[in-house]
């Protein structure tokens, strides 16, 4: 009888734990403690590898072939501002889901993106609500 009661208690504990986990995954970023604000940013959509490794990189020049190859290889996509800040796209749901599809049509282009920005220890991310190409800023393709 004790084994039966113990078994039932374990099953209830597992059900309660799995239900709590499912609820936690469905929550949005409300209540997040990260520094966040509504912003509009402008910058170049590209991979993150080169701007992190090369401090001379700018938001108005790049090698489109290099950027495309890095993204195809799995490098994260980001928006590089003229100030040198990199904003990674994130979703507004938990668990997070891939945001590459939102930025891929803009690779190599200068954009204006509006959304909720999060900052934590120097890392920046943005939940993009609107994005459009900025046509009056020319991006120079420096080749390979």
Placement of each model-derived feature along the sequence:
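Positively charged n-region of N-terminal signal peptides that target proteins for export
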Residues: 1-7
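Bacterial N-terminal signal peptides
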Residues: 7-18
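OB-fold and OB-like single-stranded nucleic-acid-recognition modules
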Residues: 20-144
């Amino acid at each position: 009888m004790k084994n039966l009661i113990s078994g039932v208690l374990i099953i209830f504990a597992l059900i309660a734990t799995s239900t709590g986990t499912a609820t936690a995954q469905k929550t949005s970023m409300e209540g997040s403690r990260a520094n966040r604000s509504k912003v509009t940013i402008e910058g170049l959509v590209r991979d993150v590898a080169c701007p992190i490794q090369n401090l001379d990189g700018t938001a108005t020049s790049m090698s489109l072939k290099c950027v495309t190859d890095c993204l195809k290889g799995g490098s994260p996509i980001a928006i590089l501002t003229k100030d040198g800040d990199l904003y990674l796209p994130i979703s507004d749901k938990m668990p997070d889901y891939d945001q590459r599809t939102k930025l891929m049509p803009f690779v190599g282009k200068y954009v204006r993106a509006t959304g909720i920005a999060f900052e934590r220890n120097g890392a920046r991310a943005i939940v993009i609500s609107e994005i459009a190409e900025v046509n009056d800023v020319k991006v120079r393709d420096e080749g390979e």
